[in-house]
Amino acid sequence: MIEVLTTTDSQKLLHQLNALLEQELRCQPKVCGLRLIESAHDNGLRMTARLRDFEVKDLLSLTQFFGFDTETFSLAVNLLDRFLSKMKVQPKHLGCVGLSCFYLAVKSTEEERNVPLATDLIRISQYRFTVSDLMRMEKIVLEKVCWKVKATTAFQFLQLYYSLLQENVPHERKSSLNFERLEAQLKACYCRIIFSKAKPSVLALSIIALEIQAQKYIELTEGVERLQKHSKISGRDLTFWQELVSKCLAEYSSNKCAKPNVQKLKWIVSGRTARQLRHSYYRITHLPTIPETVP
């Protein structure tokens, strides 16, 4: 138990954390299946880590385009990886699988009025398959994930860990740890298949611990240690994933990182499609950079 948390809000957050920790291992990708994808050769016939990562980047682009919540993106990635870790998917079918997972996540987390029509989603994504194809693939995905769409995600842990840490920070220092920056870092990690092998709690705390260490927020170090102990995360695991997160973020900000196809991000839309799309579809059309810290 985290003894210093005595307020009602803190106790509610802690109760939520305990519930997430209890459910964490349910509805996660099969690690053995992810390893098979990582070891596959890129011969155009088998699913590879590179193809998976590019598909996730496309889903992130769609999330930004429609202005959907990060939890929607997180759930879409979870569904995609759960399916890919169970099934042998041919590269030519990946687009339909990815969009089906995305649509399931959208319908599960977003308000009904914000859910796009399947026809619009396919047009915006520039795929050639039909609505019937998408619906058939949705059913296949649902069957393979045992109709369990909801899952515990690293984003949920990131939100809770951040809120719990903020409870123990003096009011004048509450803005020091930038949640938007942490959120962007998590999105970058989602675009690498290796992080789907990490427990959601470990990935979330690794990102926070790394940021606190990098920005020298000494007053938050003890709070991270308490969260680590409460979540039963070993120091070895935390260090291992921190190093991988650090490497990922370094590559993300360098020329080595394979950026999403800029041309595709322009989303060439026909006049007819543009007239049919809802106004809310034009909220965001670019990928965000990881925000700088406030001096």
Curated annotation (Swiss-Prot):
<dbReference type="InterPro" id="IPR039361">
    <property type="entry name" value="Cyclin"/>
</dbReference>
<dbReference type="InterPro" id="IPR013763">
    <property type="entry name" value="Cyclin-like_dom"/>
</dbReference>
<dbReference type="InterPro" id="IPR006671">
    <property type="entry name" value="Cyclin_N"/>
</dbReference>
<keyword id="KW-0498">Mitosis</keyword>
<dbReference type="GO" id="GO:0051301">
    <property type="term" value="P:cell division"/>
</dbReference>
<keyword id="KW-0195">Cyclin</keyword>
<dbReference type="GO" id="GO:0000307">
    <property type="term" value="C:cyclin-dependent protein kinase holoenzyme complex"/>
</dbReference>
<keyword id="KW-0539">Nucleus</keyword>
<dbReference type="GO" id="GO:0000082">
    <property type="term" value="P:G1/S transition of mitotic cell cycle"/>
</dbReference>
<dbReference type="GO" id="GO:0005634">
    <property type="term" value="C:nucleus"/>
</dbReference>
<keyword id="KW-0132">Cell division</keyword>
<dbReference type="Pfam" id="PF00134">
    <property type="entry name" value="Cyclin_N"/>
</dbReference>
<protein>
    <recommendedName>
        <fullName>Cyclin-G1</fullName>
    </recommendedName>
</protein>
<dbReference type="GO" id="GO:0016538">
    <property type="term" value="F:cyclin-dependent protein serine/threonine kinase regulator activity"/>
</dbReference>
<dbReference type="InterPro" id="IPR036915">
    <property type="entry name" value="Cyclin-like_sf"/>
</dbReference>
<keyword id="KW-0131">Cell cycle</keyword>
<dbReference type="GO" id="GO:0005737">
    <property type="term" value="C:cytoplasm"/>
</dbReference>
<comment type="function">
    <text>May play a role in growth regulation. Is associated with G2/M phase arrest in response to DNA damage. May be an intermediate by which p53 mediates its role as an inhibitor of cellular proliferation.</text>
</comment>
<comment type="similarity">
    <text>Belongs to the cyclin family. Cyclin G subfamily.</text>
</comment>
